[in-house]
Curated annotation (Swiss-Prot):
CDD domains: ThiG. The keyword Transferase applies. The keyword Chloroplast does not apply. It comes from Anoxybacillus flavithermus (strain DSM 21510 / WK1). This is Thiazole synthase. Transmembrane segments: none annotated. Signal peptide: none annotated. It comes from the Bacteria.
Length: 255
């Protein structure tokens, strides 16, 4: 099970709700994924306008934990304002802190992310900061008291998978809170690898929403994450330079 703050979840897949071809496919993909946490950009959704159609109208919100993100924020102050707006809707008490420092790479601003995380923790939010694969930054965020850390596998929407698995492993090894791999996942193999490395969960959006068949991809990601976690718990064999026979040679007759 995945434990974030006071909440417990069966699924280790967190699903984004943007970029889908239409709301019906979005709903089907959400159901196929088995995800219990759904994330959305507050700036792209008018949560105070019931007359505007959005995915919240199509799903049973009591079945999911909503995770608003502060996408679009460039400063800590902007991120805090967006988080407060989401909380005021009454739908959410968790927030994914996302403060972008570079428009081309969409990599997070480490200084502003730290500031926003500290400010929101002081206000009582359950905070999940999106960060790079910087091991020291991940440690600093945990020292502030965040409830999970979300290092990116590679740039948002790039589909490049885990570019630096060593840093991800370092982050996981020293983690005192759940590590959820966020951004850059392109296919099921990437998601499975994240879990095999020991991640507690994976957040996906583009890999599912922009797939040729989002519903099938959502199911594939669900299975990949489950398989990766099982593999991690089972313990893979070590890599070796030379072969090791799997069949015993003792007792074999020599002709």
């Amino acid at each position: 099970m995945l434990q974030i703050g006071p909440y417990t979840f069966q699924s280790r897949l967190l699903l984004g709700t943007g970029k889908y071809p239409n709301i019906d496919i979005q709903k089907e993909a959400v159901e196929a994924s088995g995800a219990e946490i759904l994330t959305f950009a507050v700036r792209r959704m008018n949560i105070f306008a019931p007359d505007q159609p959005n995915f919240l109208e199509k799903i049973d919100v009591t079945k999911y934990k909503l995770l608003p993100n502060t996408a679009g924020a460039k400063t800590a102050e902007e991120a805090v304002r967006i988080a407060r707006l989401a909380k005021a809707s009454g739908l959410c008490d968790m927030v994914k802190v996302e403060v972008i420092g570079c428009d081309q790479t969409l990599l997070p601003d480490p200084v502003e992310t730290l500031k926003a995380t500290e400010m929101l923790l002081e206000e009582g939010f359950i905070v999940l900061p999106y960060t790079s694969d910087d091991v020291v930054l991940a440690k600093r965020l945990q020292q502030l008291g965040c409830h999970a850390i979300m290092p990116g596998a590679s740039p948002i929407g790039s589909g490049q998978g885990i570019i630096n698995p060593l840093n991800i492993q370092f982050i996981i090894e020293q983690a005192t809170v759940p590590v959820i791999i966020d951004a850059g996942i392109g296919g099921p193999a990437d998601a499975a690898l994240a879990m095999e490395l020991g991640a507690d969960g994976v957040l996906l959006n583009t890999a599912v929403a922009s797939a040729k068949d989002p519903v099938k991809m959502a199911k594939a990601m669900k299975l990949a994450i489950e398989a990766g976690r099982l593999g991690y718990e089972a313990g893979r064999i070590p890599k070796k330079k030379y072969a090791t026979a799997s069949s015993p040679s003792e007792g074999m007759s020599i002709v």
